[in-house]
UniProtKB/Swiss-Prot annotation:
Homodimer. One of its GO terms (molecular function) is magnesium ion binding. GO terms for biological process: 1-deoxy-D-xylulose 5-phosphate biosynthetic process; isopentenyl diphosphate biosynthetic process, methylerythritol 4-phosphate pathway; terpenoid biosynthetic process; thiamine biosynthetic process. Mg(2+) binds at D152, N181. This is 1-deoxy-D-xylulose-5-phosphate synthase. The gene is dxs. Pathway: Metabolic intermediate biosynthesis; 1-deoxy-D-xylulose 5-phosphate biosynthesis; 1-deoxy-D-xylulose 5-phosphate from D-glyceraldehyde 3-phosphate and pyruvate: step 1/1. Keywords: Isoprene biosynthesis, Magnesium, Metal-binding, Thiamine biosynthesis, Thiamine pyrophosphate, Transferase. Thiamine diphosphate binds at H80, G121, H122, S123, G153, A154, N181, Y288, E370. The keyword Metal-binding applies. Binds 1 Mg(2+) ion per subunit. Its EC number is 2.2.1.7. One of its GO terms (cellular component) is cytosol.
Length: 630
């Protein structure tokens, strides 16, 4: 995609932040406007995360204008809002490739640019990393500054508050910027507040405060009186002094779209000692009315026409697994009032919006708090309810100890509906769901099911929901295959797979040809079936990763020369490893090939592209099997 840079006379001159810093401050508003226009033009033609970046235009310009990046460390939490940062740091002309195979990474990524201090993707990591960098900078003694930008959503995670608590305790020089685009914790935004922020962060006030502390430090009553006077002044127009109690110097809230006020305030705060906290209020989707009105809808967008008021509708397709899960929740809740559904801030992505509206008393969004969500569900189960935790595969990693300690050890009936299992696609390494089978399979008391289509998915949801212990149903991102769904009371037998294809015996076949049985786990069945037909192989849908269908495995091993396991999880510790362990424990001779994700992190690209690259499509499966048996 070729962009006419003549439409952006100032932005076209900015190839690195140093170019920005060489421009007069009075031009920053024009630069911000051009940057917002460029972002809109680029993402609308290529797709990508959208509304968050529109909301951080002025903040991004101000930070790169004030700080000497990349020498100074700038960290973006999660990274959805970092598109403007990428544009200003040498990646403007590649932005149209973002989230595409071989293109720019969807989030800040250390391998991509020296300006990306921390690789991110999951929320709430920025403050911890920034604190570590601040400690290292102090030891380095080169006056290197550290800044972390975190959103109000990410601030709900326990990890963020753990880091704030530590930072306030050890009091290293650092700046935390809260990008509050929800307006939920700050209403006092305007000229008076911006003026107060400049005043409280300015050298006269801070100098007076520090001098007073030194002068009056040995007179506790007077020191306390001075502190109370300062807090009274702040308290007239700012929110709670919670962050001050943690040990931070709190400034704000201020208008995050007034770039000159941002520059003035950040300049004032740059050289302050100790932990600083700046509260900035922004509008998600700023500058594009449709995104401002519906920031969730415009959080990530397909290609669209900015002149039109609606995003293009995708062509009618089969329901997604998320939709199938959401419908199952509603159907089950209609007949069982004990069902309760828990999600850590993923209602839209997990297909739970309708359920939340129809059954608000049975729905709990606990915010970005994966650890809490799991133990909260344990409490619900102990209390006699029937909890279902809807969570992405990559996010369940954060609740691992709670899964073991609070659910599995106590053998509680909590069902986990694990969405985005397997190869997710464009969000890259941080979001690929390729580890859940490996870290869950070793946990006692746990039943793990992997559906091959939407009918199997609902059967497994029905089955897991009725179990009196922990269960997991893991399903992929994407659409079903058009199967007819069962009723909500239909279940399947635990630990039993099904045979899909039986190899044809050819009398004239040479003895050198090996008979093959493919054991498919989960959504790989479609590609495995194509491979089995080409190879004249037996194919089974294993259904269960735990407990395995040991009888079926024994039968297949006895009747075939070679077994092949196929899964969209890491080979190490995955479903295939479970088959290996069982057969080796029997002491039986076996020739077995495990096909799955090898020992590396999967990059970004479409699901189809990554399956092909990993040789997890039908063509790749055939190649791997032929290579192995020959």
């Amino acid at each position: 995609m070729i962009t006419n840079l003549a439409d952006y006379p100032l932005l076209s001159q900015i190839n690195i932040p140093e170019d920005l810093r060489n421009m007069p401050q009075e031009q920053l508003t024009r630069i911000s406007n051009e940057l917002r226009s460029f972002l809109l033009n680029s993402v609308s033609k290529s797709s990508g995360h959208f509304a968050s970046g529109l909301g951080t235009i002025e903040l991004t310009v101000a930070l790169h204008y004030v700080y000497n990046t990349p020498f100074d460390h700038l960290i973006w939490d999660v990274g959805h809002q970092a598109y403007p940062h990428k544009i200003l740091t040498g990646r403007r002309d590649q932005l149209h490739t973002i989230r595409q195979k071989g293109g720019l990474h969807p989030f800040p990524w250390r391998e991509e640019s020296e300006y990306d201090t921390l690789s991110v993707g999951h929320s709430s990591t920025s403050i911890s990393a920034a604190l570590g960098l601040a400690v290292a900078a102090e030891k380095e003694a080169k006056n290197r500054k550290t800044v972390a930008v975190i959103g109000d959503g990410a601030m709900t995670a326990g990890m963020a508050f753990e880091a704030l608590n530590h930072a306030g305790d050890i009091k290293k020089d650092m700046l935390i910027i809260l990008n509050d685009n929800d307006m939920s914790i700050s209403k006092n935004v305007g000229a008076l507040n911006n003026h107060l922020a400049k005043l409280l962060s300015g050298s006269i006030f801070t100098g007076f405060r520090e001098s007073s502390k030194k002068l009056l430090g040995n007179i506790p009553p007077i020191k306390e009186l001075a502190s109370r006077a300062e807090e009274h002044l702040k308290g007239m127009v700012v929110p709670s002094t919670f962050f001050e109690e943690l040990g931070f110097n709190y400034i704000g809230p201020i208008d995050g779209h007034d770039v000159e006020s941002l520059v003035t305030t950040i300049k004032n705060m740059r050289n302050l000692k100790g932990p600083q906290f700046l509260h900035v209020v922004t509008t998600k989707g700023k500058g594009y009315q449709a995104a401002e009105q519906d920031p969730i809808k415009y959080h990530a967008v397909p290609k669209f026409n900015p002149e039109e008021t609606n995003l293009p509708q995708s062509k009618p397709s089969l329901p997604t697994y998320s939709k199938i899960f959401g419908d199952w929740l509603c159907k089950t809740a209609e007949i069982d009032k004990k069902l309760v559904a828990v999600t850590p801030a993923m209602a839209e992505g997990s297909g739970m919006v309708e359920f939340s509206q129809r059954f608000p008393d049975q729905y709990y969004d606990v915010a970005i708090a994966e650890q809490h969500s799991v133990t909260y569900a344990a409490g619900l189960a102990i209390g006699g309810l029937k909890p279902v935790v809807a969570i992405y595969s990559s996010f369940l990693q954060r609740g691992y100890d709670q899964f073991i300690h609070d659910v599995a050890i106590q053998n509680l009936p909590v069902m986990f509906a694990i969405d985005r299992a397997g190869i997710v696609g464009a969000d890259g390494a941080t979001h690929q769901g390729v580890f859940d089978l490996s870290f869950l399979r070793c946990i006692p008391n746990t039943v793990i099911m992997a559906p091959s289509n939407e009918r199997e998915c609902q059967l497994m949801l029905n089955t897991g929901y009725k179990l009196d212990g922990p269960s997991v149903v893991r399903y992929p991102r994407g659409n079903g295959t058009g199967e007819i769904l069962p009723s909500v009371d239909e279940t399947i037998e635990l630990g039993k797979g099904v045979t899909i294809l039986t190899a044809t015996v050819i009398e004239s076949q040479e003895q050198t040809n090996k008979s093959i049985a493919i054991l498919s786990f989960g959504s790989m069945l479609g590609e495995a079936k194509k491979a089995a037909l080409e190879l004249n192989a037996t194919l089974v849908d294993m259904r269960f990763v735990k407990p395995l269908d040991e009888t079926l495995i024994d039968t297949l091993n006895a009747k075939h020369d070679c077994l092949v396991t196929v899964e969209d999880n890491a080979i190490a510790g995955g479903a295939g490893s479970g088959v290996n362990e069982y057969l080796l424990a029997q002491g039986k001779p076996v020739t077995i090939l495990n096909i799955g994700v090898t020992d590396h992190f999967v990059k970004h690209g479409t699901q189809e592209e990554m399956h092909h690259e990993l040789e997890l499509d039908a063509e790749g499966i055939v190649i791997k099997i032929k290579r192995f048996i020959n």
